[in-house]
């Protein structure tokens, strides 16, 4: 059993993919190891702790939520603190958000993506300077960097010119058991069961998540499909979300397009399981856990042919050009019109999803330490 220090300072209130990663890895590692968890006071109620006997929470003032203050703390205070604490290694699960210097013990970092290099205008000039000039300098000081896909690993080498030998591809897992359950709380979803629906689970962020091209694809579908299927979005509104919602308000099909907002874990499995198709049109993803969640829920998946999505989906998905609404429309229509294709995709998806787990992910982290 090892003693591991994990910084959860980059936790987003439990409402993002990074949040899910942090609490999933923390809980999995705590099954067999002792964890000291650094976390802001305001985040404690949002953090689902499953093995409390092995997790020691170290609370910090919410004042540290300010990005600059938080970075300075990781740079100067944490290294000093580590001189008086005995840990086997430090794990930073959101490496692009928290700077660090060379700590006096082994330090492992997970990098999720470099989406800012692929999505023009995602960040302002100040933040892009931080991303391009500051982050790579500190990543070079890590003992090992875990990239959650080959796509992310390739970006780290291409844009940051990091040594390939210190970057380990370590695929994300997901909570498979949660999505195998046929029962889940309704949480306002029941009204959509009266009509079939195409589902997209992602924060409403423009342009990165590419909701507009999916909406345009839906508008191009045959009338029969539009009459039979709604388009349902589940996710909190983020940067540019108002652009997506304004477009829908002016669409002829605004009554067919539903925004559920953030859907909590108790209702998410039912939302997936009752979908007829999962569409993932994002321009760029470091991994794409929703693909696995949909597959485990026995829902066929169509997704972008970019970044990590084809890598994660494998032969179980149909891909499209996310820049081409016509191509998105064609793939959606093809799957919805062909029952044999749908059933084949569902079977392939169930087997594909079984290849990914948090247990496997965390084992690789520990294995790297033991090397």
Q: Language-model features: where?
A:
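Carbohydrate transferase catalytic cores enriched for Leloir-type hexosyltransferases
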Residues: 1-371
